[in-house]
C-alpha cells in the first residue's frame, strides 16, 4: 500500500492564492485541510482527500479543533500554509480604526494562531514546514498601506524569528512575499479612489501575477528536501516597479 502523502493545511482556501494552492497541492497527491469562512466555496473545488471546515483564523480554538479532526483522518500536518489575509487600504488620518483592528487580528493573530496549532507537534516530531504568505508590503511601504504594511512587516518578522527558534528541530519556516496578484484582496477596501488607482496601476503593468504563480512557489519551497529551507521568496510582475 502506498503511504499517503503528508497533510497540507491551507487557510484562506476559499479563493485567490489559497484556492490555487489547494489545487496545486491536491494535484501532487496531498490530503488537504482547507480553512476559510466560506465553506461552500472550498467544497466547490471538489478536491480528493480534502476536508473543508468553516473557520475564522482569529478563533484559535476552532482552528485547533479543525486541525485535530483532519489529523485523525490524514495523519500529522506536514505543512501549514497561513494564507488568510485582509487588505483594507486608507490614509492614516482618515481610515476607520476598526479596519486596523481587523487587519491586525486576521493578518497577524491569525498567523500566530495557525503556528500555535501545529508547532509544538512539529518540533516533537523533528519535521514540518510552515509557509506564511506575507507581501512585498512586508518589505517596503506603499501609500495608503500603513496598517497593512504594519501587519505584513509583522509576518516577515515573526516568521524569521520563529525560524531561528526551530531550526535545530528541523522545522522549516518560509515567507512568501508576492507583489500584485489577481485576487479578491482589494474588494473590501472602502475608498473608491484607491480602488480606481489600483486598477490604473494594474493596467500600466499590463496585468498582475496569477494566483497559480504564487501557488507554484509554495510547492517549490515545500518539495525541497527537509534539510533545505527556502527562507523567503519574493515575486512580482516584471513591470511592477515598487
List each model region and its residues:
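Substrate-binding pocket helix/loop in short-chain dehydrogenase/reductase
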Residues: 91-92, 96-101
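Conserved glycine-rich Rossmann-like NAD(P)H-binding loop of the short-chain dehydrogenase/reductase
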Residues: 28-43
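C-terminal helical subdomain
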Residues: 175-176, 196-237, 241
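Residue(s) in the substrate-gating loop at a strand-loop-helix junction
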Residues: 135
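Active-site helix of classical SDR
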Residues: 115, 151
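The beta1-alpha1 cofactor-binding region of Rossmann-like NAD(H)/NADP(H)-dependent oxidoreductases
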Residues: 54-65, 97
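Conserved glycine-rich cofactor-binding loop
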Residues: 14-15
Amino acid at each position: 500500500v502506498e503511504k499517503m502523502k503528508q497533510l497540507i493545511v491551507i487557510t484562506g482556501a476559499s479563493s485567490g492564492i489559497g484556492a490555487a494552492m489547494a489545487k496545486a497541492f491536491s494535484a501532487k497527491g496531498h490530503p488537504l485541510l482547507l480553512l476559510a469562512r466560506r465553506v461552500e466555496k472550498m467544497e466547490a473545488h471538489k478536491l480528493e482527500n480534502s476536508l473543508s471546515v468553516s473557520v475564522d483564523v482569529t478563533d484559535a480554538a476552532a482552528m485547533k479543533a479543525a486541525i485535530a479532526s483532519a489529523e485523525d483522518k490524514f495523519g500529522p500536518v506536514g505543512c501549514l500554509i497561513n494564507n488568510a489575509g485582509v487588505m483594507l487600504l486608507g490614509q492614516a488620518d482618515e481610515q476607520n480604526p476598526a479596519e486596523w483592528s481587523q487587519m491586525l487580528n486576521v493578518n497577524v493573530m491569525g498567523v500566530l494562531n495557525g503556528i500555535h496549532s501545529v508547532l509544538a507537534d512539529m518540533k516533537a516530531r523533528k519535521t514540518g514546514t510552515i509557509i506564511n504568505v506575507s507581501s512585498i508590503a512586508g518589505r517596503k511601504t506603499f501609500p495608503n498601506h500603513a496598517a497593512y504594511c504594519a501587519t505584513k512587516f509583522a509576518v516577515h518578522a515573526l516568521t524569521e524569528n520563529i525560524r531561528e527558534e526551530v531550526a535545530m528541530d528541523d522545522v522549516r519556516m518560509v515567507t512568501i512575499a508576492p507583489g500584485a496578484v489577481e485576487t479578491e484582496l482589494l474588494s473590501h477596501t472602502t475608498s473608491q479612489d484607491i480602488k480606481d488607482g489600483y486598477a490604473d496601476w494594474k493596467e500600466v503593468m499590463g496585468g498582475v501575477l496569477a494566483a497559480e504563480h504564487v501557488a507554484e512557489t509554495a510547492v517549490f519551497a515545500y518539495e525541497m528536501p527537509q534539510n533545505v529551507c527556502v527562507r523567503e521568496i519574493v515575486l512580482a510582475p516584471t513591470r511592477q516597479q515598487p
